[in-house]
């Protein structure tokens, strides 16, 4: 947390700490109670402000002026005792904030968040791993957030094990986003996702683990028209989507730049067929390890004989435990 005034201090357990230098407030030992925060209107950097806090509750923040704050990364992260946060967090002026990465990350006792739906996110560029709280039962309505300048939302909901619904983020502007890695990964109790079919994915390079570990997911939105022309990795994309019975038509995806497809459909145990991915360009793919492993209800696969996997180096166990697959294709790689 950084500011530029000699009048800024934090009072913890009746002792004042000067905030004129960059400090991690979590370094102040045995903080149980923040009594007051003076000079909060001078602060520009609130990163790590309550990181790994031992407090059970935060002070009233009605008087906080966040209008100059540009950095909120890790602000509440890894604070194991927070079960809730003050409702008036919703009133923070976030109009100049550019970084919200890991904001509530691993606050594993949080059951809910205040209504942050009206936060001004117009300047935010990084929202990666923003939530990642395994006991959160619900999230505020963040459907109207301005994401037009965001470049990274990777892992934003990663590991939110207790969520049964996600906010409707279907209309988010992700035109500048480059990574969707782990975005919904291990949201184990989600059955349906927002309709993300119309997302502008023209700048996405990484969709690794996007739907990884969604064990109860019953359907994938129609992502058949996604622009995948810049994507280089699809590692573990649908891995462990054990309840899925079908996938969208992926035949028109441009995979010409993809280098990694390992674990892509691994343990999609209820799939009975695959999309026609035999038309994919795999000329740059180097890794297909365990790509279809554990797809135990698939009895046939597309004709992969036309695949030209000239750079393929790793293809271990591609069709292992595909119990109903009588004839297992031999995908030829670089050494074949």
Question: Which residues are covered by each model-predicted region?
Answer:
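Negatively charged
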Residues: 1-336
């Amino acid at each position: 947390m950084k500011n530029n005034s000699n009048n800024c201090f934090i009072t913890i357990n009746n002792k004042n700490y000067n905030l004129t230098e960059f400090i991690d407030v979590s370094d102040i030992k045995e903080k149980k109670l923040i009594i007051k925060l003076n000079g909060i209107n001078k602060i520009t950097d609130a990163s790590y402000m309550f990181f790994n806090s031992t407090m059970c509750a935060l002070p009233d923040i009605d008087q906080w002026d966040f209008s100059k704050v540009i950095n909120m990364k890790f602000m509440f992260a890894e604070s194991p005792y927070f079960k809730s946060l003050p409702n008036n967090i919703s009133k923070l002026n976030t109009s100049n904030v550019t970084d919200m990465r890991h904001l509530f990350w691993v606050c594993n006792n949080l059951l809910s968040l205040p209504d942050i739906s009206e936060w001004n996110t117009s300047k935010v560029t990084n929202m990666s791993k923003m939530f990642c709280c395994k006991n959160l039962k619900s999230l505020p309505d963040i459907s109207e957030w301005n994401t037009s300048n965001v470049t990274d939302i990777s892992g934003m909901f990663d590991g939110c094990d207790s969520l049964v619904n996600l906010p409707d983020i279907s209309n988010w502007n992700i035109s500048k986003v480059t990574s969707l890695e782990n975005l919904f990964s291990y949201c184990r109790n989600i059955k349906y996702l927002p309709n993300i079919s119309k997302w502008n994915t023209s700048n996405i390079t990484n969709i690794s683990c996007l739907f990884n570990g969604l064990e109860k997911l019953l359907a994938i939105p129609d992502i058949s028209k996604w622009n995948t022309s810049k994507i280089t990795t699809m590692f573990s994309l649908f891995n462990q989507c054990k309840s899925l019975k079908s996938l969208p038509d992926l035949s028109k995806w441009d995979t010409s730049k993809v280098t990694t497809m390992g674990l892509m459909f691994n343990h999609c145990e209820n799939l009975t067929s695959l999309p026609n991915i035999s038309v994919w360009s795999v000329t740059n793919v180097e890794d297909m390890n365990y790509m279809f492993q554990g797809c135990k209800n698939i009895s046939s696969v597309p004709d992969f004989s036309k695949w030209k996997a000239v750079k393929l180096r790793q293809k271990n166990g591609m069709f292992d435990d595909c119990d109903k697959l009588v004839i297992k294709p031999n995908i030829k790689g670089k050494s074949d």
